[in-house]
Amino acid sequence: MAIQHPYHLVDQSPWPLDGAFSGLMMTSGNVLWFHTQKTNLTLVGFLLLITNMVNWWRDIIRKANFQGSHTAIVNKGMRYGMILFITSEVCFFFAFFWAFFHSSLAPSVEIGVAWPPSGITPLNPFLVPLLNTGVLLSSGVTLSWSHHSILAGNRTESIQALFLTVALGSYFTALQAWEYIDAPFTIADSVYGSTFFVATGFHGLQVIIGTTFLMVCLFRTAGRHFSTHHHFGFEAAAWYWHFVDVVWFVLYWLIYWWGA
């Protein structure tokens, strides 16, 4: 039967049910992990969830590239969806910054009426944090280079620039892990440690997600999935990565520099 509309009506798929089952397994596994220190169910649920995500997104890519299901109307809807997703991430960080300022602008007697609290040695903002700022800024430049190369039809330069972006994102994660290991305080050290590690850790998670997103785009670029006019998957990854860049600048300014 001919389709008389520009919308994509998805076919029946096992992936939503499989994803729900994997999420249930991970949640149940986390409960067991917290109470019995056994991680088997959590790991199995996590592996099933990763498998589900890979297969589901592979189907989406196939329908976009090889079946032509993603029309201009569908692309417009996905753009709105990505904007709403990034907006939800903004709300997350707004909550983290609210908690940070609530604790730092009027320190309570429990932490010595001082910020940072008594006994806390904050990290030097001009060492690893400043290096990480330079790394993320550079990754934003290389990502823009890759995007402009796609628009110009230069696939080779786009691959090179995207590879550099993925490498810089991985380097940022390694530096962040080293900073956490070497930090003179932990997440259990008063509200300072809690707000610091939750805010920077959540951002670090976004960097890992963004790096994975860009890595997929790298493979897709090498596989000639993107054209000069049809590359929303790349654009969505670029939007997300630039959002991560902006959040880091705010984190560096408020938590590392002002907060110290």
Swiss-Prot record:
This is Cytochrome c oxidase subunit 3. The keyword Mitochondrion applies. SUPFAM superfamilies: Cytochrome c oxidase subunit III-like (SSF81452). Component of the cytochrome c oxidase (complex IV, CIV), a multisubunit enzyme composed of a catalytic core of 3 subunits and several supernumerary subunits. The complex exists as a monomer or a dimer and forms supercomplexes (SCs) in the inner mitochondrial membrane with ubiquinol-cytochrome c oxidoreductase (cytochrome b-c1 complex, complex III, CIII). It is a multi-pass membrane protein. PANTHER family: CYTOCHROME C OXIDASE SUBUNIT 3, CYTOCHROME C OXIDASE SUBUNIT III. The gene is COIII. Component of the cytochrome c oxidase, the last enzyme in the mitochondrial electron transport chain which drives oxidative phosphorylation. The respiratory chain contains 3 multisubunit complexes succinate dehydrogenase (complex II, CII), ubiquinol-cytochrome c oxidoreductase (cytochrome b-c1 complex, complex III, CIII) and cytochrome c oxidase (complex IV, CIV), that cooperate to transfer electrons derived from NADH and succinate to molecular oxygen, creating an electrochemical gradient over the inner membrane that drives transmembrane transport and the ATP synthase. The chain crosses the membrane at residues 41-61, 81-101, 133-153, 161-181, 196-216, 238-258. Pfam families: COX3 (PF00510). It catalyses: 4 Fe(II)-[cytochrome c] + O2 + 8 H(+)(in) = 4 Fe(III)-[cytochrome c] + 2 H2O + 4 H(+)(out). One of its GO terms (cellular component) is mitochondrial inner membrane. Signal peptide: none annotated. One of its GO terms (molecular function) is cytochrome-c oxidase activity. Its main location: mitochondrion. GO terms for biological process: mitochondrial electron transport, cytochrome c to oxygen. PROSITE patterns: COX3. It comes from the Eukaryota. Its EC number is 7.1.1.9. InterPro entries: Cyt_c/ubiquinol_Oxase_su3, Cyt_c_oxase_su3_dom, Cyt_c_oxidase-like_su3, Cyt_c_oxidase_su3-like_sf, Cyt_c_oxidase_su3_a-hlx. It is an enzyme of class 7 (translocase). Belongs to the cytochrome c oxidase subunit 3 family. Keywords: Membrane, Mitochondrion, Mitochondrion inner membrane, Translocase, Transmembrane, Transmembrane helix. It is found in: Mitochondrion inner membrane.
